[in-house]
From Swiss-Prot:
This is Protein CbrA. Belongs to the CbrA family. It comes from Shigella dysenteriae serotype 1 (strain Sd197). GO terms for molecular function: FAD binding. The gene is cbrA. PANTHER family: CONDITIONED MEDIUM FACTOR RECEPTOR 1, GERANYLGERANYL DIPHOSPHATE REDUCTASE. Coiled coil: none annotated.
Length: 354
């Protein structure tokens, strides 16, 4: 059986970034359930907006986005809607509108050939034995068994690695539901929607390449019903839908306490959403995926004696930032406080009317 220095499970932004950064420095194997190219396979429900912090990560790495990853149009404000209060405000934001699936495949394409990458595979089992991590996965129609000194869980909200390391760990989860429609709005826009009767998280919309995408994060039990109810409510705010072209669904984490951030143990590490590194106030996770990958790269290459403790300490600033997002989320989802902020007009940019 083949042995590696590092086995990475999952090649979203976090896993792809780490694999790229370790290439040529350590012997790495990376496993991913997405296809290598094309439009088939798993596509994560995501508004597809690249936040300024994520943009800074690309500046740091000297990377530029290819044109086929960038979506049209580029929107410079977010229309914030409080459904219960019937309030709408416009706030300036500096996001880059991207095609999320194309972005994920592009990130994978940057991984050098020295990394052994398996696409469209199923990781079936992991365990630790004789100071090694064992991984069994199915690829190309047959099962393979490898070992690694270090195991990295970059496998998102339903992380197999996190469940193995922390079987009793509980974190709030929501179902993210998103539908695509033919664009009917005369002026494209991006929106953030709050309705506490529907969800204590939030919903969103984005215009992208001739489509209007509407989605949100809802309680697991009756998420589809709540999503449908909110769609009906949004007609009062001039949202236009029609027949859905495509529907997407996945689990999303919603950290609500300091203990929700878990970094790993026993030479296993968690990065990105698998570690709980996702903003509770916006559900933005790409920037934290890239940052945690960079932090772990540095730790792995330095090889400190207590390597898991070193990673835990190195992510302290990141975790504090994310804890601040939890506090911000509680403010944004508190109806009275949100209503007061929006009515105050702070940072609101009124749109001129003809």
């Amino acid at each position: 059986m083949e042995h590696f220095d590092v086995a990475i499970i999952g090649l979203g932004p976090a896993g792809s970034a780490l694999a790229r950064k370790l290439a040529g420095k350590m012997q790495v194997i990376a496993l991913d359930k997405k296809h290598q190219c094309g439009t088939e396979g798993f596509s994560k429900p995501c508004g597809g907006l690249l936040a300024p912090d994520a943009q800074r990560s690309f500046i740091r790495d000297g990377l530029t986005l290819p044109v086929d990853v960038i979506a049209n149009p580029q929107i410079f404000s977010v229309k914030t809607v409080d459904v219960a209060a019937s309030l709408t405000r416009n706030y300036q934001r500096s996001y880059i509108n991207i095609n999320r699936y194309a972005f994920d495949l592009w990130m994978k394409s940057l991984i050098p050939a020295s990394v052994e990458v398996y696409h469209d595979n199923l990781c079936r089992k992991i365990w630790r034995e004789d100071d090694k991590w064992h991984v069994i996965f199915r690829a190309d129609g047959w099962e393979q068994h490898i070992t690694a000194r270090y195991l990295v869980g970059a496998d998102g909200a339903n992380s197999m690695v996190r469940r193995y390391l922390y079987p009793d760990h509980q974190i709030r989860k929501y179902v993210a539901i998103q539908q695509w429609f033919a664009e009917k709005h005369p002026v494209p826009f991006y929106s953030c929607i709050f309705d506490n009767a529907i969800t204590d998280c939030y919903s969103w919309s984005i215009s992208k390449d001739g489509y209007f995408i509407f989605g949100g994060a809802y309680p697991m039990k009756d998420g589809q019903t709540r999503f449908t109810t909110l769609k009906e409510k949004m007609s009062a705010f001039q949202f236009q839908f029609g027949k859905a072209v495509k529907s997407e669904k996945c689990t999303v984490l919603f950290p609500s306490r300091w203990q929700d951030f878990v970094c790993g143990k026993d030479n296993a590490f968690l990065i990105g959403e698998a570690a709980g590194f996702i903003s509770a106030s916006s559900l933005e996770g790409i920037s934290y995926a890239l940052d945690s990958a960079e932090i772990l790269r540095s730790v792995l290459l330095k090889q400190p004696e207590k390597i898991n403790a070193a990673y835990w300490h190195a992510t302290c600033k990141l975790r504090l930032k994310l804890f601040g997002k939890i506090v911000k989320s509680r403010c944004l989802t508190a109806p009275a406080l949100r209503k007061w902020i929006m009515r105050s007009g702070m940072a609101h940019i009124p749109q001129l009317k003809d």
